[in-house]
Amino acid sequence: MDAPSIFTRKKVAYACATLCCLLWGSSYPAIKSGYELFQIATDDVPSKIVFAGYRFLFAGALLLLFALAQRKPIARLNSRQCGQLAILGVTQTSIQYIFFYVGLAFTTGVKGSIMNATGTFFSVLLAHFIYQNDRLSYNKAVGCILGFAGVMLVNVNHSLSDFSFVWQGDGFVVLAAFILSAATLYGKRISQTVDPTVMTGWQLAFGGLVLVGGGYLTGGTLAVHSAAAALVLAYLTLLSSIAFALWSVLLKHNRVSMIAPFNFVVPVAGTVLSAIFLGENILELKYAVALALVHRDLVGK
């Protein structure tokens, strides 16, 4: 009988989940810097999709090379598993990001951040109906509400006074969050028969390739104008490979409702790190309260 994985230990799982979300949070300022360095206009969605596609394509390739270095059989997949990985790549990476980027083009960053946080609710609710050992409880519901409140508080400003709902903007971001949640649960099932690193590598590479092709076909372009631009893309590639692979391992060995709420850390971490690296203002009481709410959500799971 195999020994329990180290990732089943709560302290290890929590530390790794926090690391993943801090890495994803750091992508906020990195992506903003990337748009400037690659000279991508704010409304140039196709070029943004190309940029994201290369990020995931390279991240997937990096993970597959890492799996090869560990002597894991990256090509020993049957036709059913290949189909599953293709579906996972198209949904979790391609379709999800297309809806996300198109949605952001028709809504504000504030509303987009809040709407995207609904993904945690979807993950917990879907897990409730799929897994018998992952039912929704009072504490989980309260924790999700507190975490969502923290995300909303980070985004409190005058723009919230007119919080209308636009389907092509806000609706697309919510739809992207739902697709990501559903695809993540699908990935959890695949990881029971395919190594998580191999699974993540193939889905990122395939999904990224679809994004690159789709971005170019719709008029997107991408040119490296400086070494700094290449370094930013390299960092985004590295953080994606580490965070997505580690997240897949965590979901394989733990309940979804135990890991998913850490996603509330991402927008808060993104705000804090943007303030540090992009010089944005963070010396406001709302940020401290938001961090406290998110922390209360995580320790109360």
Task: Outline where the language-model segments fall.
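Hydrophobic/aromatic residues within transmembrane alpha-helices
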Residues: 34, 51, 103, 129-136, ...
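Transmembrane alpha-helices of multi-pass small-molecule transport proteins
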Residues: 37-92, 122-126, 179-183, 200-218, ...
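Helix-helix packing/entry segments at the starts of transmembrane helices
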Residues: 54, 93, 111-118, 185-209, ...
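Hydrophobic transmembrane alpha-helices of multi-pass small-molecule transport proteins
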Residues: 63, 125-126, 138-157, 264, ...
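Specific transmembrane alpha-helical segments of multi-pass solute transporters/efflux pumps
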Residues: 68-112, 116, 153, 236-254
